[in-house]
Amino acid sequence: EQEKPDVVHICTPHYLHVPMAIYSLERNINVFMEKPPAISFDQLEELKKAAAKSEAQLGFCYQNRYNASIRAAKDLIDSGKAGKVLGARAFVTGCRGAAYYTESGWRGSLKTEGGGVLINQSVHTQDLLCFLLGDPTTVDATMTNHHLKNVIEVEDTLEAYIDFNGVHASFY
């Protein structure tokens, strides 16, 4: 209460992101958040309302947008030099073992993590698809728990077909 930093960088377990961000925004302190911004749609709406009322700025860390190769691809797409984008494929091949979830005290739970591979491991790849291709117009997805059924309650596998205004992408 006595200090007023220029910015707060929130890099805590997911379930703490929104309460900490709202606390800071209500005090007009700029907020920079790690992913995910929220663990539910309702939380995201609360965060948006707090940001709209605040004089402070709210930002999210999607750092892969600034990789040189991604910037070059974005420039080629936006300039038309790459031609028309017809489709895309994105694969997240990493796999987390049981210890990643069980030793954290909060991962693997809908209440505290908010989801699994969708909002944790693959979120940066999803962001790059949107950054390069625009906002999705339709999404057809299946999520399941193939590998850690008796360990976590969130999904560990996601398959999606995403349409970006006529550009079709497969995501796994």
What are these regions (language model features)?
Residues 10, 36, 62, 117-118:
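Glycine- and other small-residue-rich loops at beta-strand/loop junctions that grip anionic moieties
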